[in-house]
């Protein structure tokens, strides 16, 4: 009966969270709901003010639950893709939870948020021995990780992290995935018309050569080494734009 009541509790928590507006850069109400639960569990946390740099209204929430041994990090994001305003979650008779049909449900990533909060609750209620748990709830993840981009990662002591933000079978996890690499290149050259004097300073031919070189796997490996993290870039997905000035 205890496990059954815990299952119902986490479902009710998920239902509660998915009924809260959480558009990117408008996560204030969601952040307040999460912080209220952390207060209830007496788990200390801080919320940064990086939203001032991004035009949002809520920051990244970082919490710690003390334990023994090496720390580990649990992470999820507070926002959902649009439309995520005016949400209303519906718990159907068959046990499924859906949106009302006019907005997204927001399971991405409120399922992860609910799982982390319920994990913290169970650890405390059952007095289960555990490692130190660091928790990071980021904002504006759906806008190419704007929130986490400004987070002060020096606060994190964990070398092991689980980001609860993927679909799949229970008990499975992803350990790598493609990523997006954007860079801007400025090329200074001589004024020249490609139709009359291509041999002098044709930018098109130079851009074509640059694109060809950049698409080679060896260069991608160099780019990957200069990046933080281990996500491999997608080979050949490079575009170049130029303008005559």
For each feature predicted by the language model, list its residue ranges.
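A short glycine/serine-rich beta->alpha loop
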Residues: 98-107, 192-197, 234
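Acidic-enriched catalytic cores of C-N bond-cleaving enzymes acting on peptides and small amides
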Residues: 197-231, 237-239
């Amino acid at each position: 009966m205890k496990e059954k009541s815990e299952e119902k509790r986490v479902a009710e928590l998920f239902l509660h969270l998915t009924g809260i507006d959480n558009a990117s850069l408008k996560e204030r109400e969601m952040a307040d709901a999460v912080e209220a639960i952390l207060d209830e569990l007496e788990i200390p946390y801080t919320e940064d003010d990086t939203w001032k740099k991004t035009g949002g209204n809520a920051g990244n929430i970082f919490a710690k639950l003390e334990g023994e041994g090496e720390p580990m990090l649990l992470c999820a994001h507070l926002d959902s893709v649009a439309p995520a305003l005016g949400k209303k979650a519906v718990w159907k008779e068959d046990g499924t939870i859906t949106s009302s049909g006019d907005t997204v449900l927001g399971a991405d990533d409120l399922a992860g948020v609910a799982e982390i909060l319920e994990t913290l609750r169970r650890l405390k209620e059952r007095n289960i021995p555990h490692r130190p748990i660091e928790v990071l709830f980021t904002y504006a993840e759906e806008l190419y990780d704007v929130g986490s981009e400004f987070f002060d990662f020096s606060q994190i002591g964990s070398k092991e992290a689980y980001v609860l933000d993927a679909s799949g079978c229970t008990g499975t996890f992803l350990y790598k995935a493609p990523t997006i690499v954007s860079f801007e290149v400025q090329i200074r050259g001589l004024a020249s018309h490609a139709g009359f004097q291509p041999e002098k300073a044709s930018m098109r031919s130079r851009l074509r050569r640059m694109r060809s070189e950049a698409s080679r796997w060896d260069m991608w490996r160099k780019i990957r080494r200069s990046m933080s993290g281990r996500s491999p870039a997608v080979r050949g997905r490079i575009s170049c734009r130029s303008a005559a000035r």
